[in-house]
Amino acid sequence: PHFFAGFSGGRKSILPGICSQETVNENHSYKAISSPYANTGVLEHNPIHEDMLAAAKMVNVQFIFNVALDGQKKIIAAWAGDLEKAHAEGVAFIRKWSQCPSITGDIVVTSNGGYPLDQNLYQSPKAVATAEACAGEDGVIIMCCSCADGMGGTHFEKLITMGTVDEIDGYLSKIGRAHV
């Protein structure tokens, strides 16, 4: 799963994989990420997924090879072939083996699973987004993240050190308008 593209694999090897920074910024824009469909496990109507798929089709991807990893990062399954068909098969496998009934708790402890997934603070919301579904109302989420590479970029550092929620919201709205 991917916390705003729905699932990893397939079209992600093109976007963000080999695209320009400008294209990645547009795909990862506030406007796109703020869509209610830009969420873990959601592909239908997901603007980020749809944009990634359009980019992959634009360059006429003929073949993909994707794998699923276990907790020890060992390959447990693989899919190859048509961009959409092979990706759909992988998604079905992941849905079957990774989804479980939701359990809520007052305190949820989470991580991204180690380097490079927790390389900086910018990457950390992935763990929080997943934990959010498990935290009860007024629950507490404790995120464990090494951040070996620091904050994750000057723009991100500026955003999280801005101050008030209104200042942050204004900044994000400005960014959203710039990427319409």
Predicted regions and their residues:
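Conserved small/polar residues in nucleotide/adenosyl-binding loops
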Residues: 178-180
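Conserved, well-structured core segments that form the ligand-binding/active-site neighborhood
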Residues: 1-101
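Long, well-ordered mid-to-C-terminal structural blocks that present hydrophobic/aromatic surfaces
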Residues: 92-164
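A sequence-level detector of short, solvent-exposed, charge-rich linear segments
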Residues: 33, 37, 71-74, 84, ...
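Gly/Ser/Thr-rich active-site loops/lids in small-molecule metabolic enzymes
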Residues: 15-32, 125-143, 159-176
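Residue-identity detector for glycine
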Residues: 6-10, 17, 41, 71, ...
